[in-house]
Design a protein with these regions (language model features):
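Short intrinsically disordered terminal tails
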Residues: 1, 178-179
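A phosphate-binding catalytic loop at a beta-strand-loop-alpha-helix junction
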Residues: 112-131, 135
């Protein structure tokens, strides 16, 4: 497992690599993604071949949505919604607000359900929650971030506040997410 010596060495410059698909499989049955209204960019939708794509039971068993204005999943798809801002964590406590959600998403995924964790662009809010699910599964924070960037986009967790939160977790904080 990777463990950066200095956090600033890990926070690298971003590239012009937006995701080329609405949803990306990070690990078997565990997906990260966005919504159809990402930036209102129809050109991106055409490139990604996702115009008119809705979430149905054929796609996912469970959807965890972290963008309050997202279109809901279709009938018979279990969906949990908790909107929060893609910004600083000054008025938001991840443990208080996300721990139960992360436990539920992890439990659904480990029970064999196909799980989507999504926000608007599929980069930051979904990124912090996906990283916490991976941490719960035993990943180190840096390894979880690298996996998401390798699978989805180098822009995952371009919100440095979210990235720093994950990379600065103490052993005691990691234990909270893992138990």
């Amino acid at each position: 497992m990777t463990s950066p010596k200095h956090i600033d060495e890990f926070i690298r410059p971003r590239h012009n690599e937006l995701p080329n698909e609405l949803w990306t499989e990070t690990l078997p049955n565990l997906w990260q993604g966005g919504t159809l209204d990402v930036w209102g960019n129809e050109d991106w939708f055409e490139q990604a071949n996702i115009i008119g794509k809705e979430i149905t039971k054929k796609d996912f068993d469970c959807v965890y949505t972290f963008y309050a204005s997202a279109e809901p999943a279709d009938w018979f798809v279990k969906e949990l919604r908790f909107g929060f801002y893609d910004s600083a964590l000054t008025d938001f406590d991840p443990v208080e607000n996300l721990l139960d959600i992360v436990k539920m998403a992890h439990k659904d995924w480990k029970s064999g359900k196909k799980v989507l964790i999504r926000c608007q662009a599929g980069l930051n809010r979904s990124g912090i929650v996906m990283a916490l699910v991976l941490i719960r599964d035993g990943y180190e924070p840096a390894d979880a971030i690298k996996l998401m960037r390798d699978k989805r986009s180098s822009w995952v967790l371009c919100n440095k506040n979210f990235e720093r939160y994950l990379l600065n977790l103490t052993d005691e904080q990691l234990a909270i997410w893992r138990n």
